[in-house]
Every structure is written in structure tokens, then in C-alpha cells.
Amino acid sequence: RYNKIAVKSDFIAVFSDFSGGRFKLKKLSRYIKILALALSAVLTLCACSGDGASSGESSSAPDYSLDTSAKVGYVYNEEISRDNMTYMFEKSRKDIETALGLETCYVDGVAVSQFENAVKALKNEGCSIIVSASHVFANSALSYAKKDKDIYILSYGGTASLTNLTTFRPKLYQPAFVCGTVAAWNSASHKIGIVADDLMYCSNGVINAFILGIQQIYKERETDVEIIYAETKAQTETAVNTLEGKGCDVIFSYQSDDYCMYYCDSIGMRSIGFTNDMAYSAPKYGLVGYYLNWATFITDTVRTCINDNFMAEVYVGGFSEAFVKLTPYSAACKKETLTIADTLYDYVKKGKAKIFEGEIRDKDGLARVGAGATLDDMQVLAMDYLVYGVTYIDNIIDPVPNPTTSDLIVKKEYVS
């Protein structure tokens, strides 16, 4: 019979090893496994439980600005919806109106080829500050900012800045890494599926971080990772059904909407995905969601524009800046999940755990990151390979010969 006090002392001893500073992930993996085994024993024999709290921290609202004459326009690649990534930007649009008292508007469904015309449409409506709300616009935003110095542009996903252009990028690989641990701990079949859009921001980096997170619990080939690239709802359903048929019992989604989670929930499949509202996206079988929390950053940057103290930068934010967050872990998770995942979250947030620390091999076994080396954000963004552990890959995305374009109508309404 286990002794609660003795086990608790073991936990303290385990974690005290890390108090001296940074450690290697291989060492972390070993301790997470020790923690997992101990937790399992304690929870089974002593009926302990977690509290289900969220890992994220909240940001305070900015003060009102005196100058309310400026107008802010958003350019969206997709049509705005509660179900896709635009919803995370819409929160920032509301915050700008509430915190700064400014008027905002947007153009949605904009193709890359329409970016300049979309900006001009917003400019004609009086907008002097533009939020380029998709990474696919990064090059277009840079080009436009070079020739129009009368406006400020905040560009998502860009890698360069100008006197009137600031860019911001999220470390989405950080929550993906923790999510990998959640998936591994909640998988009984040791087969985990990924449904992703390969045109998403930092697609390989996010997927690789998720796989490396799995490997914090299981060794490289102790769990099969099977990937299907899909974009539309029909393709997503096909992908999920295929992965379920191959024995996967947890699905990780990296797409611009939450439909994969919704569909997984409808068939009783556990899922993890890009959402800030698990109760909306996957109320029954969703494990955890990850999302972008950039409203405060965007609002503060807009304030610098209207107060004439704009400072161009290339901003990269992660857990420590509360720029990316995790939702609370759901009741569908095993009870041990909270402690295991939050332990890893805390180390990543504090910079003690380096996600992409070598040696890292690609799916074919070729060393891509040498022992002791660590990739920086730009190197993660440039990853053109998948890490070792992937056992199946398929791409069912069909090219769209005549993609729809925007009518470039400037709108103000919010989605409910």
C-alpha cells in the first residue's frame, strides 16, 4: 500500500533537481515518466484528483487614449466566423473599441492578390491603421508598407519591420508541445492522429513540437503518429474517419477552424485543437485547446500609433508573454493530465525546457539538429521536415482552380 506522505516527498525530491536551472528535455522526459507513474499510483490507490485549472494568465485592459480620431481596419483572409481563427482577431477588434474608444472595421474573404485593394478600401473609409490578420499576407503587407507611409500596418506572421510596419508571431509550438504530452497520456491505443492544413503558419514546427511532446511520455516508436493533411469539412471528416480506422484514439488538429474537433466530438473521438472555447468546439470528448491571446498586444501597439510613439519591431510571443495559451483541461482527460501537463507548461514558460534541443532526427532517421544544439524561432519557422516518429502521411487537399475572392465591402458587425 502506498503512503501519501512518502510519495509527496518523492515528488519534492524529483522537482528539487531542477531548481538549479535549465535541464535537457531527455532528462525532463525521464522525470515526467517518473511523475506519471507515481501520480497514477497515488490516484489509483489514494483517490487523489486535480483541480482542472487553466495554465494561462489574464492580461489587464489598457487605459483609454485621449485621441479617438484614428480608425483601425482589419484584412481577413477568411470570412469572419465564430468557428475559425478570425474569432481570435475579433476579440482584439472589440478591445480596441472598448479600451481606446476607436472605430474599427474590416474586409474579409480577401485573397492574397487582393490585399492592396483591400487596404485601399479601408483607407477610403478613413483607416490609418491596418491589421493584416493572416500570415499569407506577410509579403504583401511588407510591400505595401514600403510605398505607403501614411498608414501603419500590424502584420501577423511577418519576419521584417519598417518605420510604419510591425510584425508579430506566436510561438504556437509551445502549446503544441504540451498538447503532445496530453495526447500521449490520454491515448490507450498508442496511435495518435494529426489532421492539419499544411498552409497553416509554421505548420511543420507546430506538428513537430506536438510529436516531441508525445515523446516526453513515450519513446519515439512506442506511439505511432499518423498525419493526414485536410482543409475542407468533407476532407476533415474523411481524414478523421481514416485515422480512426487505423486505430488512432486521439486526434490533434492544426487547421484554421475548429471543425475537426466538432466532428471528433460527434463520433466519440478524443481531440485537441485550435480553439479558445472547448465547451463550444468539443464539449464531450475534447481534451484541451490552444489559442492566440494577442488582443492586449494589438491594442497596445495601436495605442503607440495614435500617440505618435510607434516603435517598429518583430515581436515573437509565447507562454511567458501570455501570447499563446491553453484552455482548461476538460473532464475527458485522465486525472493525472493536469499535473503532468502543467509541470511541462511551467518549464517551457520559464525557458528551462527547450523544445527543439538536439539531437533531433527527421522521419527518415537523418539527424537534423545536433546533440546540444537548439533551434531558434526563425529556424523552427523554416523547418521543412517532420521529426522521427511519424509512421503514416497522406495529403487529401485538392487544389482549388478558381478560388473565391472578396467583394471588398467594408463591414463593422461582429459575429455572435
Annotate the PLM regions:
Residues 20-21, 56:
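Residue-identity detector for glycine
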Residues 56-416:
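A residue-level marker of the well-folded mature domains of exported/periplasmic proteins
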